[in-house]
């Protein structure tokens, strides 16, 4: 028969008393009033903060965007199909933040920095807020280091510096993404970490870009953030901030690439494209019943982009001179750069590269319209060698454009005008460049020097591209001294000019034979 021992009972009671926790847990809880279209209205949550993360019963995360008198309007970061009216919502007390660190290199993540490439979890070295304040005036330094894109037309006429924000703008299918990807490919071995943010794109397009970067060895220094077209508007809205936060970690903290012991603190960010982010934000704002403004965008759509792009900077020496360069992409409709979003982003950035569909269809690729493309601060970052040859190129091309328009109406042209037109055609031809084939500064300087100094005048226009390719191959293999001279001095020295002239004359002689 079972006997009850008083000492056992007393020890159990004593244990229970000792384990008893008097600590109270206070949770801010609300109730779902209405849910649908990626938006939830929640009653309660009196102490909710703006942009606070909310957790729904089914595990879906939301962000509180509208704080109204009697309810909170939240956007859902998932489908939210199992959220029911009347279910409870818990305020987490946290603002949206993501893990950051070197482990993200070579990975594809979503807008919440969760890996989507099937290569396992990523362990971040620290956590950063998605919305961080941009560096102030004292924390910045003016742009002075070049960020070479490898595209001759850009590096010569619209140079980009580290810490600059240069807009790439044009109609669909004019080569905007190609310029961005070429720039990423050209950073190989140059100590720059790249972040490519794909907003509202097809998953197949993103997969194609990942494959291009992987096959050319660029994925090891690149992070890809993807919020595809089928994902909720909230994730498409957040993706650029996620990419920016990952880039900011590099700018402020620096990191070492695999197989290298050198710490790098320069980052390049591509937002492809901010038009789709603005559309996602408009969708969210209209569903939250915010008043619509021009083109039905909310009144704070300028602030949406300005607070993102102002985070790109060149830091002062006190902060380590890190840099975050931004290449936002904007898609125009029928070349209309005076629409709301294009004008907003043009006014925020330090210059724009305008791509023209007419030029693209005529065979000029990259289809850069040099007339309305500009770099407001990049000139200070251009290397001396490029500056020396680019001035003449820009002037000759401007005169050629004027003459070309005039020559359409004139029947008889004098010899000097004909020679100028012929030179202009050859200059335009050397600026053509195939996809995914960036050139080094030395190669760009060589071909511009050859064209502006008349070395290509006796070559047929159709033969310019083959000549350019063969000459650059010859220069790399037989006159490697020239490349080394440009690389070490960053200037077109007398020695470099002599080597280049000799190489051009020797090569033309062998070609004629």
Swiss-Prot record:
Belongs to the ATPase alpha/beta chains family. Produces ATP from ADP in the presence of a proton gradient across the membrane. The alpha chain is a regulatory subunit. Keywords: ATP synthesis, ATP-binding, Cell inner membrane, Cell membrane, CF(1), Hydrogen ion transport, Ion transport, Membrane, Nucleotide-binding, Translocase, Transport. GO terms for biological process: proton motive force-driven ATP synthesis. It catalyses: ATP + H2O + 4 H(+)(in) = ADP + phosphate + 5 H(+)(out). It is found in: Cell inner membrane. One of its GO terms (molecular function) is proton-transporting ATP synthase activity, rotational mechanism. ATP binds at residues 170-177. It comes from Gloeobacter violaceus (strain ATCC 29082 / PCC 7421). It is an enzyme of class 7 (translocase). This is ATP synthase subunit alpha. The keyword Ribonucleoprotein does not apply.
